[in-house]
UniProtKB/Swiss-Prot annotation:
GO terms for cellular component: cytosol. It catalyses: L-alanine = D-alanine. Pathway: Amino-acid biosynthesis; D-alanine biosynthesis; D-alanine from L-alanine: step 1/1. Its EC number is 5.1.1.1. The active site is at 40 (proton acceptor), 263 (proton acceptor). GO terms for biological process: D-alanine biosynthetic process; peptidoglycan biosynthetic process. The lineage of its organism: Bacteria, Bacillati, Bacillota, Bacilli, Lactobacillales. Its cofactor is pyridoxal 5'-phosphate. This is Alanine racemase. It is an enzyme of class 5 (isomerase). Substrate binds at residues 136, 310. GO terms for molecular function: alanine racemase activity; pyridoxal phosphate binding.
Length: 367
């Protein structure tokens, strides 16, 4: 989707806030711990290349979801190590070697498929993924882990790391987290040779389970100033939200009682009202279920009336405002603030999804 810079709708990204969040997290983890910045999904909607360039001196490497995201970073001139967290296509091995990426290996079948195709693995670097209870990808038995390690090393692969991912690190109960941790530790203790890099800490683990950090952490949601638990757990220290979502009034009118708004005529004015149009809609990631949520104009909460359209929303104003008046959808306006977590709560989802859904049609502006 092509960006629309000639619209007033934009996402403002505070790169300094991201750097401060990295420094804040770094100050609360053991000295010498490697810091990997997770910039998958366009850096959680913040812009992968711009974010990675801004923080490259603050981190030891980057994590992405797939090889195309990794290629984007290399082609932008970023030289730090890049770990691809997902399972890559067999055909991607040559690209991984060419661009010096680190691949995730999650199963013996994948390795065997490479060997069956006689793919040259010499010089490839990998991390082994352990499924300690997340249930998506990874080895579950130590015998499989050691078999994979032996096969890979026999064919010239550098098995640099081993990692897992926790399913409930951002929840109040530690029971399942501790069970996963023990399973991961058991596998490590049973291995004849543990790879150099061992990491299990995502943002939530880094924040609330610092005592369980191995020798590297993966900084994701929290790096962007978001609370991984939403509103379930309090942050142990301050983080600065890096993203503000803004637009402006493009049409303002006074309507009589009985006037209807939007598809389905789901809103009807019960009195004379001031209604304004804002150019953002579900094609931008401001989803259709946001009817009745409020945005901020002149420091005041103004409800979205009528259904969210593909490109526009209508809001009710307390009075007439001139065209071009700023509208804040996420961020501060006057003495009020709307957070990504508040948007997520209204949608019955998580703040990760709110920022990741902001489409490429919204220009990102950096400061």
């Amino acid at each position: 989707m092509k960006a629309s810079p000639h619209r007033p709708t934009k996402a403002l990204i505070h790169l300094g806030a991201i750097r401060q969040n990295i420094q804040q997290m770094g100050a609360h983890i053991p000295q010498g711990t490697l810091k990997w910045a997770v910039v998958k999904a366009n850096a959680y909607g913040h812009g992968a290349v711009a974010v990675a360039k801004a923080i490259q001196d603050d981190v030891d490497g980057f994590c992405v979801s797939n090889i195309d995201e990794a290629i984007e970073l290399r082609q932008a001139g970023l030289s730090k190590p890049i770990l691809i967290l997902g399972v890559s296509e067999i055909e991607a091995v040559a690209l991984a070697k060419e661009y010096d990426f680190t691949l995730t290996v999650a199963g013996l079948e994948w390795i065997q498929a490479l060997l069956d195709k006689e793919v040259d693995l010499t010089g490839l670097t990998v991390h082994l993924k352990i499924d300690s209870g997340m249930g998506r990808i990874g080895f579950r038995e130590v015998s499989e882990v050691e078999q994979a390690q032996d096969l890979l090393q026999k064919h010239g692969v550098c098995v640099e790391g081993i990692f897992t991912h926790f399913a409930t690190a951002d929840e109040e109960s530690d029971d399942y987290f501790n069970a996963q941790l023990e399973r991961f530790k058991t596998i490590l203790a049973s291995m004849k040779e543990v790879p150099e890099l061992v990491h299990a800490s995502n943002s939530a683990t880094t924040l609330w389970h610092v005592e369980t950090i191995f020798n590297a952490v993966r900084m994701g949601d929290a790096m962007y100033g978001l609370n991984p638990s939403g509103a379930v757990l309090d942050l142990p220290y301050d983080l600065i939200p890096a993203l503000t979502l803004e637009s402006a009034l493009v049409h303002v009118k006074t309507v009589p009682a009985g006037a209807c708004m939007g598809y389905g005529a789901t809103y009807q004015a019960d009195s004379e009202q001031v209604i304004a149009t804002v150019p953002i809609g579900y094609a931008d990631g401001w989803t259709r279920d946001m009817q009745n949520f409020s945005v901020l104009v002149d420091g005041q909460a103004c409800p979205i009336v009528g259904r969210v359209s593909m490109d526009q929303i209508t809001i009710r104003l307390p009075k007439l405002y001139p065209l071009g008046t700023k509208v804040t959808l996420i961020g501060s306006n006057g003495d009020k603030e709307i957070t990504a977590t508040q948007v997520a709560t209204y949608r019955v989802t998580i703040n990760y999804e709110v920022v990741c859904l902001l489409s490429d049609r919204i220009p990102r502006e950096y400061y």
